[in-house]
């Protein structure tokens, strides 16, 4: 599961060869939650979208927590995400870290999960556009089984892409992208206790 993350520009610009279109003047985001806006990168470049996917075929543009994550194991079949998947509407969601609240000694305690190398984590996502009286640009983050480094934090984690398979995810065929749904990141990760900024809820969202 992934229900909160941060996007710090300093981290993004350290990986300029991957995030070539990341704006220099975009605002840092310290606590992004579902339905909030975040930066994404698709085959055409950088785009801000709202987190929680609205299918293009939906009758009304309703953002729902239930669509902020999509299971990698079922994304190709689930009706909410199937159209975006078949149309190769894939994106990456670069984050400097994401957050989970494992229960420790009976208490939910916020932990910040990040790469030990300080470079952004590249979360696999899908995007869609709803068109009505206006346009709503939205995305979801794919989730998978956790790697052993952080399997004590939560029974799900974002599907992380490594630098050498970003091009295939963004520009490859559906069959090529399908092979990445079971990819296991080679990045070394850390999960450290973290105090959220004032105003953060620390809530856990529904499992995905």
Give the location of each predicted region.
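Short linear sequence motif anchored by a di-proline
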Residues: 1-208
